[in-house]
Curated annotation (Swiss-Prot):
This is Ribosomal RNA small subunit methyltransferase A. Belongs to the class I-like SAM-binding methyltransferase superfamily. rRNA adenine N(6)-methyltransferase family. RsmA subfamily. GO terms for cellular component: cytosol. NCBIfam families: ksgA (TIGR00755). It comes from Mycoplasma capricolum subsp. capricolum (strain California kid / ATCC 27343 / NCTC 10154). The lineage of its organism: Bacteria, Bacillati, Mycoplasmatota, Mollicutes, Mycoplasmataceae. S-adenosyl-L-methionine binds at residues 10, 12, 37, 58, 82, 105.
Length: 266
C-alpha cells in the first residue's frame, strides 16, 4: 500500500534501525507504551515483544486494517483516531501502570501539536521518544545562543531532560522524504515545573517573548506588560541586559523573570 502524503506517511522497515529506536525507551517490561502513528506496524512488532501493554493510535483506516490483520496480540490495543482529538489523560486513566511512555514516528506537519499535547500530560509520563525532522530535533535540544533555540526548546527543557539520540538518514524511509530525520528522547521530571505555580501560563509567556526574535527582550517584555519602564526595572533587578534578544536568555532567567512579574508584589 502506498503512503498517503496528506497523512505525512513515511515508512521504515530496517530491523536494525527499528531495534535501535525501541532501545531508546526504558527497557522496563512492566509499562504502558502509547505509539502514535504506527503505520504498518514496523515499531509495533518490536514493542509488543518487549512491553506488557501497547496502545497504538492511527488515523488512517487502511493502516488500521493492516494492523488488525498483522497482529493478534493480547497486549495490543488498536485505536483508530486523530491523536490531536483524543484526551490522552482519559485514555491513560483506563490502565493501571506507573510507567507510561510515548513513542512516535511523527508526521512532520503536526510535530509541534503532538509535542505540546505530550508536554501537557508530562506528569503522567516517564519518557517520550520521537522521530522528527532533523532540524526540529536540533531545535528542541538546543540551548541559549544557539541558532535553533526558541520557545519549543525551552518548553521541552521545562518538562524534561532532552536528548538528541541519533540521526536517521532519509534513505531509510520509503517513500524517501526531502530531509533527514532524528530521534530524540524526553525524560520527564519536575526540576523546573516545581519552581512555577502555573506551567501553562509560563509556556505562553515564553512563547510571547519569542514572537519577534529580532526585537530585544525589553521590547518583547513591554508587549506583555504594556509598561516599558516597569519592564526595564524587572530586567535590572535580575541583572539581565535590556539589549539581549530572546535566544540569549536561558530557562533559569525566564523562570526568574516570570516569577518576578506574576508572583512577587513588586
Amino acid at each position: 500500500m502506498k503512503a498517503k502524503k496528506y497523512y505525512g506517511q513515511n515508512f521504515i522497515s530496517d530491523l536494525n534501525l527499528i531495534n535501535k529506536i525501541v532501545d531508546v525507551l526504558d527497557q522496563n517490561k512492566d509499562q504502558l507504551i502509547i505509539e502514535i502513528g504506527p503505520g504498518k506496524g514496523a515499531l509495533t512488532k518490536e514493542l509488543v515483544k518487549r512491553f506488557d501493554k501497547v496502545v497504538v493510535i492511527e488515523i488512517d483506516q487502511d493502516m488500521v486494517e493492516i494492523l488488525k490483520t498483522k497482529f493478534n496480540h493480547s497486549n495490543l490495543e488498536i485505536i483508530q483516531a486523530d491523536v490531536l482529538e483524543i484526551d490522552l489523560k482519559q485514555l491513560i486513566s483506563k490502565y493501571d501502570y506507573k510507567n507510561i511512555s510515548i513513542i512516535s514516528n511523527t508526521p512532520y506537519y503536526i510535530t509541534s501539536e503532538i509535542l505540546f499535547k505530550t508536554l501537557q500530560i508530562s506528569d503522567l509520563l516517564t519518557k517520550a521518544v520521537f522521530m522528527l525532522q532533523k532540524e526540529v530535533a536540533l531545535r528542541i535540544c538546543s540551548n541559549k545562543n544557539e541558532n535553533n533555540y526558541n520557545n519549543l526548546s525551552i518548553a521541552c527543557q521545562f518538562y524534561s531532560q532532552r536528548n538528541f539520540e541519533f540521526v536517521v538518514n532519509k534513505k531509510m524511509f520509503y517513500p524517501i522524504p526531502k530531509v533527514d530525520s532524528a530521534i530524540i528522547s524526553l525524560t520527564f521530571n519536575n526540576i523546573y515545573k516545581k519552581q512555577i505555580n502555573d506551567d501553562k501560563k509560563f509556556i505562553e509567556f515564553v512563547r510571547t517573548l519569542f514572537n519577534n526574535k529580532r526585537k530585544t527582550i525589553l521590547n518583547n517584555l513591554n508587549n506583555i506588560i504594556q509598561n516599558k519602564n516597569k519592564a526595564l526595572e524587572y530586567l535590572k533587578m535580575l541583572n539581565i541586559s535590556s539589549n539581549l534578544r530572546p535566544e540569549q536568555l536561558d530557562i533559569d532567567e525566564y523562570i526568574k523573570l516570570f516569577n518576578l512579574i506574576y508572583i512577587s508584589n513588586f
